[in-house]
Amino acid sequence: MTSARAALAAFAVDAVLVVLFAATGRLSHAENVLVGLWTTAWPFLLALVAGWLITRAWLAPRAVVRTGLPVWAITVAGGMVLRAAVGQGVAVSFIIVAAIVLFVLLVGWRALALLVS
């Protein structure tokens, strides 16, 4: 796989996992997933894009420490800032759960990829 394809694939995995996080969160609160999925996901997706740009993640898209950790941190922090800016909830419990789940997802897949390669 070319480096451009690897980077695009890694970004796609990250984006799908962020949407999965948003969908499971809505399901866990017995909310309609399809109706509110975009409302829940967009702040984290926008923050994910920022994380990729800030860290230049395409240079080492599968790296756990160089890419995974900062992309995760920027996605969580940026997503929460954007949610707060538009009046969405940012309760401490939500911040903690989001940080843990997104860590497992965004850093976890990279760690698994490292283990199997």
Please place each PLM-identified region on the residue numbering.
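Membrane-water interface at the C-terminal end of transmembrane alpha helices
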Residues: 13, 103-117
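Small-residue-rich segments of transmembrane alpha-helices in multi-pass membrane proteins
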Residues: 17-19, 44, 70-82, 101-102
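Internal alpha-helical transmembrane segments of multi-pass membrane proteins
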Residues: 36-37, 55-74, 92-99
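Alpha-helical transmembrane segments of multipass membrane proteins
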Residues: 19, 23, 53, 77-85, ...
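Membrane-helix boundary connector in multi-pass membrane proteins
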Residues: 81-97, 116
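Alpha-helical transmembrane segments and their membrane-interface exit regions
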Residues: 47-50, 100-108
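Membrane-helix boundary elements
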Residues: 2-36
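Structural signature of hydrophobic alpha-helical transmembrane segments
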Residues: 35-46
